[in-house]
Amino acid sequence: MPLLSGLYNEQSWRCFLLRWLIFGVLLSASWYVHPLFSLCCFVPYFVTLFRHKANGAWYLQLFILNLTWNAAVTYWLCQLDVVRGSGALLVNSVLFLLPVILWRLYVRYGRIRHGQALALLLWWILFEYAHHLWDFSWTWLTVGNVFGKAPQLVLWYSWVGVMGGSAWILTGNYLLYQLGKRSWQTQKAYVALMVIALPIALSTGWWLLKQPNAAAPEKDITAIATTMGGTDEISDREKMLIVDSLATCDKKPKGITLLPEVLLSDDVWLNRFPLGDLYAGLKHGIRSWHTDNIIVGALLNVPDAEGLHVEERMALQQHYSRYNAALMINASDTLSLKLKKVYVPLAEYVPSYLSFLHLKTYGFAKDPYNTNHFDIDGKKYFIGICYEVVNSLFITQSLKENTNAILMLSSESFFGESETGRQQYMNICRLRALENSLPLVKSSNDGIVMAVTARGELQEAKRTVRPYVMHAAIRLSVPSCYHVVAKYLPYFLMALLGLLLVLSVCFRETFAIAFEAGRLQLHRE
């Protein structure tokens, strides 16, 4: 086949252009048409990757493919801010070279002759794992996230998580790459087909045959969408008047009322808030809204001698830290507080070691010891604030054995006019519900309000253009085994890499002994 031979030609830049075009088309189709395209879209990438000669042109070609990948999926970053968006695409494309560089060094200095593809897979999943943990985590492009549009095909994410999905997708692509390289041998084709199709068949059967537990307890959650973007110049008092009119007119009893992220943003201080009018209005809302609990997002200022921000009142300066927080108000006199811990890199949070850059940012602080759960009526609810829920590892490692649901406060004003970003965000959140087997309810300032079942199904979803109240009766659950598996995943991957090194040494010694024995035998003859 001329097209296939052109795709596998290793020398010509013209053939690389063909691979680049096919890669871009298939990758875009996997995100915007159907995620099943992801099971073949990386074949052109592997054709380039497994060239024997690694030189400057090779790294340049991989960088171009990485940039195409980033741009095809998150092009909307440039719609929000051309300079920062372009910088993010370029930096992330360079970062995606890191697992390849580590793999090349590992193969070269470990003298790995067998299992090179397995080593690449292990390094790639380790990279995805590490990319979840540092200050500049941008986990949007974790390969397994592509199946957010069709969670019914990957119900087994509740066992191995989204990174298990990455391993499956990359393995399927590698097998197809080998098939094309060897002219589609029938026996190899059966193996590739089984690897690709069996997980889908098992997941589909599970979806059809195993119904949700009808005996599980339910909880009524009311999520309110305000359609007030984070940049709207409107006072907190006016915002609460709008919310109050919505919630008061809705006469249905509410177990939990979930308001959006950073709804309160006008000079909200932790030590003054319980004494102010906004708090009094929310306490009054417990009765007038027919609800038992109100969870609201706030830009919260906390006095802190080492804080980055300074307030000047009556000629006195006070340092403070600013947090993106969720507050829970109910009939008790206790104010429950959850502080956001995972931020959009640079836009929301700049590490202290980069403070010399003086970047324009919200300047949020972190408190890793603050709770992530609210206890309501004997049940535990994980509180996720916007970008936190994109991070698979943060969610699963923060859950407790008796967590019953995920409640999300989001703004989505970050996406501006980009509906593509909002849709991707919604689908990624669906995977967080699926891989942890927990229902998820999401409020929003300027986006999609939704309720998701523990299997990732959309129970309710609405892109709001005017203030909206959504009611959802969610079926409470408990975390899947993934939150246990995730703790040991890096140790398992590193153990396999170590085992490959040991086996490589054993093979070399065995080969050397066999070669020497053969040479002596020939010498005797």
Give the residues covered by each predicted segment:
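CN hydrolase (nitrilase-like) catalytic-core segments centered on the catalytic cysteine
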Residues: 121, 262-264, 272-296, 355, ...
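Short, aromatic- and cysteine-enriched interfacial helices/patches
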Residues: 1-8, 275, 350-359, 363, ...
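Membrane-embedded alpha-helical bundles of multi-pass enzymes
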Residues: 2-210, 417, 444, 459, ...
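Short, conserved active-site loops that position catalytic residues or coordinate cofactors/metal ions
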Residues: 31-47, 69, 74-76, 225, ...
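Bimodal feature
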Residues: 250-251, 311-318, 364, 401, ...
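Non-cytosolic juxtamembrane linkers/loops
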Residues: 15, 197-251, 417-425, 430-437, ...
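Soluble catalytic regions of membrane-associated enzymes that act on cell-envelope
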Residues: 206-344, 373-378, 383, 387
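Active-site catalytic loop in hydrolytic enzyme cores
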Residues: 79-81, 130-162, 280, 315-396, ...
